[in-house]
Amino acid sequence: MSVRIRRAELDDLDFLVELLSHDEVQPFLAVVRARDPDGVRAEVERSLSEPDEFGRFVIEVDGARAGVMGFQVANRRSRIADLGGLAVHPDFRGRRVADEAARQLQRHLIFDLGYHRLQLEIYGFNERAQAHAERAGFVKEGVRRRAYDRSGEWVDGVLFGLLREDLEAEAGTP
């Protein structure tokens, strides 16, 4: 199985809208994430025009579109990026596709674009995503208790981070 990530293109819009609206994907995505065609188009266009500060990437498995993930700059001076919007189509789940895709995005952001820190936040009820973050090398850094209103219920946000030196140590580079 070959997994690769690539920057999303306008030709990916139908796939992205369908994936982000899928009944098995949508409940786990942050409310602020664009799902409508115009919002997704704006994100893809921004990713293409601001590649160092904003990105939407398509995950492919053996050449087939399988998912999406993204980043945006959180702090330019300190070189911090927020990661988010990871979604894998249910047909590709259970194969650790997201783990390999996350590693590729980490290497791109840290070694190619020069970010120092990558961070993400996951809903407390999303145990699958938390396990993925830990498998992908992220360190659990804390919990924002009852931080988000999801359909009238307060849920926690679990914070994860990865530093350049974490990835360098893993890769065996100084």
What are these regions, as identified by a protein language model?
Residues 111-121:
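Conserved GNAT acetyl-CoA-binding A-motif
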Residues 2-4:
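Extreme N-terminal starter segment of soluble prokaryotic enzymes
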Residues 7-11, 21-93, 108, 113, ...:
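Acetyl-CoA-dependent GNAT
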Residues 119-122, 139-155:
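Conserved catalytic-core motifs of GNAT/GCN5-like acyltransferases
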Residues 113, 135-136:
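Structural motif
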Residues 88, 94-108, 127-135:
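Conserved acetyl-CoA-binding loop-helix of GNAT-fold acetyltransferases
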Residues 146-174:
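C-terminal "cap" of GNAT-fold acetyltransferases
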Residues 64-67, 128, 154:
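Glycine-rich acetyl-CoA-binding "A-motif" of GNAT/NAT acetyltransferases
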